[in-house]
Amino acid sequence: MSNDGENQNLYLKEEVYFEPLFNQWYAWPYLIPPVTAARYTDKTHLRIMKSFVNNYKLHILAAQESELSGGEFLNCSESEVEEIKSLIDRTETHYHDFLELSKAVSQLDKLLLNHTQGTSLEPLYQQVPDLLKGYVELTFDRHHRAGFRLLEPLLYQSKFYQPQLQTLSFGLMSKVNERPFVLSTPRLADDDHQQVNTHFNDRFVDEIFKSRTQPLSRTQVDALFAGKELSGGLAYEDLFTTQPPTHKPENVKDGVLLRYLGHAGFMVQSEYVTILIDPIIATRDEKIKDDIVSFTQLPDFIDYVCLTHTHQDHVNFETLLQLRHKIGKIIVPKNNGGELQDPSLKLMLQKLQFDTIEVDECEQLAIHSGIITSIPFFGEHGDLNIRSKSAWTIELEGKKLFFGADSANPDVNLYKHLTPYLTDLDVYAIGMECVGAPYTWLYGALCTAKVPNTIKDTRRLNGSDASQASEVVELIKPKHIFVYALGMEPWYKYFMGIEYNENSEQVQQIKQFSQTTQQWDIQVESLFAKRDLFLPNLG
């Protein structure tokens, strides 16, 4: 920054990217609830870091192979081995109770798996590990298999919810070639980053991100950073510029604007209402400056955000925390209530100071000149009992749009029952992640026993394929079809961990889907980077 006075207007640079961290790891949804955070810290983070320390040369070589970017290879240099050792030691020394909570889950699972006779569970309460006593209810399913239910609200009030492990990391796109994959590499305070030791609910977060469009004075910037514990070689002054943003929002005066935001994100906008679906906003830099919709192009107020499911590429705190100051309400699918693999999105978001509405399947929410409807979502979760997933239909100003994200169609009878909600669609948007990873890639840390390969290989994170999507289209005959949510954009590789080519099965399925829908004179468009569709008001 220049030295032109304390009251000079300063804006957060468009190329600034932000990563919310939990114990130096990228904070995806399962690192917010205490028990799942403990499991991933114990069974994923420590395991990968210890593997790196013991075999760092192998990790360094693997990290250079693009096709391995989504694997469990820690992307750090040999010079950072000692820092990883320190992070291991700090985690095991200072957060011993937290790790013991993870072990308590394993012990409780073992206790209940051994109770096979189907007799009352009441005597087992005395054998529940001490750290979980009073936080779990022991239950049977209808087939007399014992399990437990977590009391999530109480756990958020306990010592196991540790916001002191939350920190903020800032970087400049011009200083990095590629961001490491988020699920395999902790974020160290290196020369290219500024890390701020404060929790996600600090007003600092909202004030900083407001300054993308609402300038701060130098005095205000200094005051925000004053007293904060800072680490890393990037000076906070370098995050700001005197140049106001050149990319600004566009107003909608009539009809409905559908704007694709990249990956799984959409914006639906009328004159009076703005709705985002699964927003993941890319950071603008010189390489992609004209290819994306950036933070500065979003409206000053976002009435609703609809989230489809609790995967890191759909509930993205990197984006949501940057938008929190301008979000009205977040709408989320109803939760099972207490299942380890299915933490409550409502509780999670409320803990991060979002105004959150939880809706049941087929429940409708009235909005200005329209309705938001929760549509049942099957698939993409490895057959785990996870209820926190929903597709959405949005009716606005007489237009009707469906956003299916990664939902699959294993039984077309569901969509036959749903036709009253899906008739007269202007837009049918569906993902085609038909070759997902084994479910243990994402949920392995929650398993307390080794999962056989025969199970892993069949239970995958699969969404729709061409055949499944075509069955739905044949029923509902939408005007427009978009395929999206595949992570095609290379700038999202850091959280998707995948690359595609012409021979990729997903690409072949999109071609097959497009050929099939020609019989109904409906074109399929595969979305990439950004796309606008204006739906005029014909009334």
Annotate each language-model stretch with its function:
Residues 314, 318, 378-475:
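Active-site-proximal loop/helix segments of hydrolase catalytic cores
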Residues 450-451, 455-459, 471-472, 476, ...:
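Short acidic, glycine/proline-enriched helix-loop-strand junctions
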Residues 229-253, 335-399, 515, 519, ...:
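Metallo-beta-lactamase
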Residues 257-260, 274-278, 371-378, 400-406:
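Active-site-proximal beta-strand elements of phosphoester/diester hydrolases
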Residues 3-206, 238-253, 267-310, 317-322, ...:
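Pre-active-site segment of Zn-dependent metallo-hydrolases
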Residues 293-360:
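Active-site HxH/HxHxD metal-binding segment of metal-dependent hydrolases
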Residues 311-315, 337-340, 363-366, 381-382, ...:
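Active-site environment of divalent metal-dependent phosphoester hydrolases
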Residues 268, 278, 309, 330, ...:
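Divalent metal-coordination and catalytic microenvironments
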